[in-house]
């Protein structure tokens, strides 16, 4: 499963990770560097497993923890209405 931002959501890299802006509501979310890496991987067409691999490669985190973090991130982004699953290509 890969993700895409829904229409009306902008993304910007920051010194501390990534910021997402919901242009419809004016709300924004700050993602820390690990969440930003995971989301970037998913937005670029990567799978959850690839996002986990990126996290375990670049940070001192085990696969189980990274997997939980990716699952939590995706769930929270879906709940906030910021992302949707990308159509299969």
Per-region residue spans from a language model:
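Long, charge-rich, low-complexity alpha-helical segments
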Residues: 27-89
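Acidic, low-complexity/disordered tracts enriched in E/D and polar residues
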Residues: 1-36, 40, 86
């Amino acid at each position: 499963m890969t993700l895409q931002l829904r229409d009306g959501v902008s993304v910007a890299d920051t010194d501390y990770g990534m910021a997402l802006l919901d242009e419809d509501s004016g709300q924004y979310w700050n993602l820390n560097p690990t969440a930003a890496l995971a989301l970037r991987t998913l937005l670029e067409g990567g799978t959850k497993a690839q996002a986990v691999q990126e996290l375990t490669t670049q940070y001192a985190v085990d696969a189980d923890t990274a997997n939980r973090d990716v699952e939590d991130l995706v769930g929270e982004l879906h709940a906030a209405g910021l992302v949707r699953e990308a159509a299969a290509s």
